Amino acid sequence: ALRHRTAALALGVCFILPVHASSPKPGDFANTQARHIATFFPGRMTGTPAEMLSADYIRQQFQQMGYRSDIRTFNSRYIYTARDNRKSWHNVTGSTVIAAHEGKAPQQIIIMAHLDTYAPLSDADADANLGGLTLQGMDDNAAGLGVMLELAERLKNTPTEYGIRFVATSGEEEG
């Protein structure tokens, strides 16, 4: 009988105590996002399909969090150096993703990370496997994008004094 009462008491305590959902540890969301971006969008060089797809993915993430978000394209060019030292212009169209969080004051805080990976600027770069389609870019710069997306996730319902603009850029190596 004592054993039954103890079991009933233990079972009752289980239903009385509040259930606490475990919240993700700081950095978990950033880690998941960075790994997703690096895995599913390797070779995110400015103007490539992978760069455009990753920009759209980031825009969608911001929109799912409730931010106004859009993609703006820009044209740029850079000098590519061939093996024979001949230089030529390469034209690219890059993408920038911008998401907005309004604040009380007109001033803004800008949080930036670049979404593209390194593009080979010469045949020597390509030969040394610097950049290119296989580069996953965890440190260039999926990790920065992950941190930016976690900040956006954590701030989405927080009133702020200043507005916040999250900006994911591309083309910084090319100019």
Residue ranges and their predicted role:
Residues A1-L9:
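Bacterial N-terminal signal peptides that target proteins for export
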Residues F40, R72-N75, H101-G103, M112-D116, ...:
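Active-site-proximal beta-strand/loop segments in catalytic clefts of secreted hydrolases
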Residues T32, M65-Y67, A105-I109, T160-R165:
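Loop/turn elements at helix/coil->beta-strand transitions in domains of secreted/extracellular proteins
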Residues Y80-A82, A119-S122, E174-G175:
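Extracytoplasmic/secreted cell-surface and envelope-processing proteins
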Residues A8-P18:
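Bacterial N-terminal signal peptides
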Residues T93, G132-G175:
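Acidic/histidine-rich catalytic neighborhood of metal-dependent amide-processing enzymes
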Residues P26-F40, A50-Q61, V97, N141-V147, ...:
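Stable alpha-helical elements in mature extracytoplasmic
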Residues H36-E102:
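A non-catalytic alpha/beta surface segment that caps or lines the substrate-entry region
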